[in-house]
Curated annotation (Swiss-Prot):
Tree of life domain: Eukaryota
Keywords from the UniProt entry: Disulfide bond, Glycoprotein, Glycosidase, Hydrolase, Lectin, Secreted, Signal
Catalytic residue list: D152 (nucleophile), D210 (proton donor)
Signal peptide residue numbers: 1-21
The reaction(s) this protein catalyses: Hydrolysis of terminal, non-reducing alpha-D-galactose residues in alpha-D-galactosides, including galactose oligosaccharides, galactomannans and galactolipids
Keyword 4Fe-4S: no
Name assigned to this protein: Probable alpha-galactosidase A
GO MF: alpha-galactosidase activity; carbohydrate binding
Family to which this protein belongs: Belongs to the glycosyl hydrolase 27 family.
Pfam family, one: Melibiase_2
Places the protein is found: Secreted
Gene Ontology terms: cellular component: extracellular region
Organism: Aspergillus fumigatus (strain ATCC MYA-4609 / CBS 101355 / FGSC A1100 / Af293)
Presence of keyword ATP-binding: no
Amino acid sequence: MDTTKSLLSTLIAIMIPLSLGSVSSPNLLPTPPMGFNNWARFMCDLNETLFLETASAMISTGLLEAGYNRVNLDDCWMAYDRAADSSLQWNTTKFPHGIPWLARHLKAQGFHVGIYEDAGNLTCGGYPGSFGHEALDAQTFAAWGIDYLKLDGCNVFPEHSRTLEEEYKARYAHWHSILKQMHHPLIFSESAPAYFADPANLTSWYEVMDWVPAFGELARHSTDILVYVGEGSAWDSIMVNYRYNTLLARYQRPGYINDPDFLIPDHPGLTLEEKRSQFALWASFSAPLIVSAYIPGLSSEELAILRNEELIRVDQDVLGLQATLASRGLEVDVLTRSLEGGDRLLTVLNRGDGVAVVSVPVEWMGLQRGCPYVVKNLWDGEVQVLEEEIVIRLNSHATQVYRIALPDECSTVIPTGIVFNTASGNCLTDENGERVGFEACRGSETQIWQVSELGYLRPLSRTSHCLTGGSQASVQLCTEQKNQQWAYAITGILKNEHTEMCLTEGTGISQCGFERDSQVFGLPSGVDIKPS
């Protein structure tokens, strides 16, 4: 059965140049998407009834009103064969009324509709991939009423003597060139980076991350979140994707969003505290809030997590910044970022298995001591005023999130946090004297750095001193000379403005290479990022 031929002729006429996707046109997806996807909960067990029941439940539970306005179909929705004209066909058993009918029904209820395809010759589930049919598939999806495309990366093999990374780039670039010609470009979710997220060597991963923001609006960057029937620890799976996301903050900006995968609030392997933590962390990252759960069966506690207005407001903040690590201890992470209107966000995670009590000085938040900061707990709404520090008690795997209002006289924020090697996870450490090195992060102020607008890095342990370049990296009294200025690039390198050498774990400083693991670093949110 040819399910698309009659619809395609109407679309060809509107495939005209109008706008670009990605960072060149941030208005296409100005804030992270919110909605539902079937994969982590149901995998290939999807059908028309599931999506109708899900949409109905999203309306009755208030999720649509809260902002969850997307319903996305993942793999296995299609027939195993293309039609006679090579167009894609839906599985008529799973979708007896057809995808166009389903899309119209969902849109009439207030939802946007997304769909899944693959850059290879087959999808991950063995269904027809888009390779060689990209323009036709884009036309098909638009004709069906689809406005969001998740493009996976299974079964991609190099062509024309290209490397594997070059092949992925060519295919995703080709899709981008097609989508940007559309009158209404589809939101483009790229899965390419996930196929290069090898912790043994991150260089190829970063090569891919360098180009995905130019082609699409968001990218699935690493491992899949644990599916409902999967083996292993769901919490460990969340922490793996959380860690990967902390390595990529420099890429996120208006028009491009890092995607650490789905929210899984009904996973049986998670405690309620862990479900709250995943939501709080994803919101702090301004990550997509795409729920993969049985929506009609969510408990009142799970729904309360997903409908938290304050955390949704953080996630949807128009600045689009990603929270970054102000401090990392053996068990506790402290993350911060700025919000629209000048507020600061403070997020504190207890990764450990026991109760943790942590004191967070205002300096760790990039603020100055002695000012009356109004702090609101975004879980319970409690408000307090602090001038020096906040003391937080956290249960195992719990996360607290605070919104901090700054008085006008104390509105200056200095980007502050750890400088860590993204491959090893080790922190740049002021070792006293003039020595500087990389050590396991331990939550010490010798590992927390202030980064000025001019590129001076000062350890909180002695802010009169600066990271200094020369024959080796050192910490010396700040003289604000050029050898104490550092430029942070989108590739993750930290280059000394005087020597033009790069900070390097293991040797301290060396000739700048191309995204070498030893030279790629995470810095605090708010630091100026150079193109390269």
